[in-house]
Amino acid sequence: MKQLMLYCRQGFEKECAGEIQDKATQLEVYGFPRVFKNAGYVLFECYQDGDADKLARELDFNALIFARQMFAVAAEFTELPSEDRISPILAELGEIDAFPVCGDLRIETPDTNEAKELLKFCRKFTVPMRQALRGKGLLLAKENAKKPVFHLCFVASGHCFAGYSYSHNNSRFFMGIPRLKFPADAPSRSTLKLEEAFHVFIPREEWDTRLSSGMWAVDLGACPGGWTYQLVQRSMFVHCVDNGMMADSLMETGQIKHHMVDGFKFEPDRKNVTWLVCDMVEKPARVAHLMGEWLIKGWAKETIFNLKLPMKGRYDEVLQDIENLKTFLIENKVKFKLQAKHLYHDREEITVHIQVLSNISPH
């Protein structure tokens, strides 16, 4: 197996390609990315047979910013007959000894308007395909979350890629996209960005301790309150920092304090803030440095923030800002865990999460 499939946001194929090239090289896997403009995916072509499996196993999926999902490609089918798509797939995969027995099946498409027209077909195709794979011993009789995931990605009605991902090193979401519903009472759609970030960055079993009621949070650039809404829904108390107006529905909860000041000048009077969130429209380097300042001063224990991306050089900007932030924290002897992702609800921006692992007294 020489190909690795990576899903990404349409229009960000170049950034996804640059990232997988860098990450593969770090693992001494050599090859080149095959980029299709606005396709919503990138194919990384490895020179060595078996290297796609190595990447699927060893390349930390959570370390990828622009990829929503990745899987090793075992076979590509370009002219599947509409009357019988299953038989050619089974015949080809039956010849591949290295294909693992899988515990789940996902029949997906890239996230483009053209490809998503195939989703109705994918849903209908799933049941007979699942039965056929089980009959051939390629899929277990019962779903098993510990086994690899079988992926079929259709880019056209007769054109698909078949492969697998490892359950410990993939996105657990169909197409790599969490399915979230916009709350009718939320002040803005930006609320879904923070909700998705919680799903992606924080294990569900840790929500009760890391996103618990009674915590204090700070929201920089809060107006009108899309991100604050998520914190209030979790029964937190929030310092909302913005010169604009907050939604009346949030003010009426009694859980927020509105500070009409510049987010870059605000200092919390309370020293028990757990969460710092920030979605300010500012230069990404400036926002990243501000987040670092808060963390080294012990003003917050965890932060989720967005970095707005420039029109050109987006990948380079991301690398530089994150590297500078890491260096700043390390120089100030802060132990931390950092993750970054181009979320489904992000557009020209990425979302970064940092958890401080050091015990820092606020100062």
Swiss-Prot record:
EC top class named in words: transferase
Chain residues that bind S-adenosyl-L-methionine: 190, 223-226, 242, 262, 279
InterPro entries: RlmM_FDX, RlmM_THUMP-like, RNA_MeTrfase_FtsJ_dom, rRNA_MeTrfase_M, SAM-dependent_MTases_sf
A Gene Ontology molecular function term of the record: S-adenosylmethionine-dependent methyltransferase activity
Domain of life: Bacteria
UniProt entry keywords in alphabetical sequence: Cytoplasm, Methyltransferase, rRNA processing, S-adenosyl-L-methionine, Transferase
Entry's EC annotation: 2.1.1.186
Reactions it catalyzes: cytidine(2498) in 23S rRNA + S-adenosyl-L-methionine = 2'-O-methylcytidine(2498) in 23S rRNA + S-adenosyl-L-homocysteine + H(+)
Catalytic residues as annotated in Swiss-Prot or TrEMBL: 308
Subcellular location(s) of the protein: Cytoplasm
Example GO biological process: methylation
GO cellular component assignments: cytoplasm
Summary of subunit composition and partner proteins: Monomer.
Protein family: Belongs to the class I-like SAM-binding methyltransferase superfamily. RNA methyltransferase RlmE family. RlmM subfamily.
Function per UniProt: Catalyzes the 2'-O-methylation at nucleotide C2498 in 23S rRNA.
Record's protein name: Ribosomal RNA large subunit methyltransferase M
The organism of origin for this protein: Vibrio vulnificus (strain CMCP6)
